[in-house]
Structure formats: structure tokens, C-alpha cells
Amino acid sequence: MNYIYYLCLQMKKLFNIAGPCVPGEHYMIPALERNNQAERLIENKHYFVIHAARQTGKTTLLKSLVQHINSQGKYHALYCSLEAVQGIDNPREGIFQIVAQLKKALFFEDVKAKEVLDEIRTDADFTTLIYLSVARFSQALEKPLVLLFDEVDCLGNGTLITFLRQLRDGYINRDKIPFAHSIALVGMRNIRDYKAKIRDDGKTLGSASPFNVITESFTIGNFSPEEVAS
């Protein structure tokens, strides 16, 4: 018997409170079974928000979704954490860093379409950089793109507004120009909380609010007594 495989068989599962849970390594309730509305929203081409408190399983859910979606072969799902963009309010810098995180998320993926991101100039207009990156990548893929952005809370207000405006531009024009089939924005706040936070800082969103791109949101609840008992 392979020695490493033998060691894996001998490993005991652990309770995990530091980062996403891994099936086979940690005691966990299957994330997709508890949050099956995510698949429905993706199938219906929605852009949506998942919000919940810390350590409630958001990242575990996203990673489970990526694995499940890609195993089915219908869509290409990509997980992208925006934690490294934390606190960058200037969109000229923040938007460039978001694209850098997209490239990082694709680095180890065997997807030829990722090469199109390298063709986009680093000095491109920041007001269209996200839009062009997602549009070109979507066009180069052989399957519809599902983007799962984690830690959206980290974005500074200026970066967040510019980021969402470009997603909205892609959303409303995707009948003519390829763009993401579905996008999830994940963090601790609901979309209404983002709007309130920015308005409290005295910034106007205008009539074409970038938050109008979001069609639905849901939260991850606490475990039920039945789930704990299982």
C-alpha cells in the first residue's frame, strides 16, 4: 500500500476553526447541502451576495461550489479572494490589484484562456480594466464563467464603487458582449449595508447605482440542533 495513502487513512478528523474546512480532514456538515440556493442563483444567471459573520463557512462554501461546478463540466467556476486589496480606496490602484488577484487565482489552473489577461496593458484605463478583463476571459473560455469573489468587505469605498460599476456594465450588456454568467460577492455585509456605509461617507451613487447589479442575497445561518447532532 502506498505509504502516503496509508498515512491519510490513519489521520483522524479534526474540528477546524481556522480557515476553510476540508472534507476528509475536518468534521463538517456538507456546505452545499446547507446552502443549495447558490446553485439555483448560478443556474439562473444571477449576480448575488452571500453575507454572514466570521467563521460561519463562507469560504468553505465557495471552495465547495468551485469544485462541484467544475466537476459537472457545464461552467467554469473561479474563486478569487480580494483580501490582498484591503483598504485601498483609490480605484486607480485598487482596480489594478483586483485584476492581479484574478491572475493569481488562475496561475495554477490549466486554462489556456487565462493568457488573454496577460495581453491587457497594465496602464489601461482603470474605469474599464475589470470589465475588459472579465469580458475577454469570458470570450476565450469554452464554458460560461462563474466568478466567486471572497472578502469583498476589504475593498475601500472608491475601489468598491468602480468595481461594481464595471460589473454592472458587463451584466447589462452581456446579451451582446461575453461576460460572466454569474457572480457572487461574498463578505460579512449585505448589499444594503454597503450602500449605507458609502452614503454615510457623503458620496452620491447617482441614479445608475452600481448596486443595482445585485438581484438577490442570502446569509449562512447557524447550525440547527439536527445538524449538530449529525
Regions found by a protein language model. Give the residues of each.
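The start of beta-strands in P-loop NTPase/AAA+ ATPase cores
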Residues: 46, 76, 145-146
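The catalytic "switch" region of P-loop NTPases
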Residues: 18-20, 159-230
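An amphipathic alpha-helix signature
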Residues: 91-99, 225-229
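Conserved catalytic segments around the Walker B and adjacent sensor/switch elements
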Residues: 71-87
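Walker A/P-loop-proximal flanking segment of P-loop NTPase domains
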Residues: 2-56, 60-69, 132, 136-137
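Mid-core helix/loop region of P-loop NTP-binding domains shared across ATPases and GTPases
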Residues: 101-149, 153-165, 173-182, 210
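Non-catalytic architectural context of zinc metalloproteases
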Residues: 66-75, 92
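Short acidic, S/G/P-rich loop/turn micro-motifs used as interaction or catalytic elements
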Residues: 85-87, 153-156, 191-192
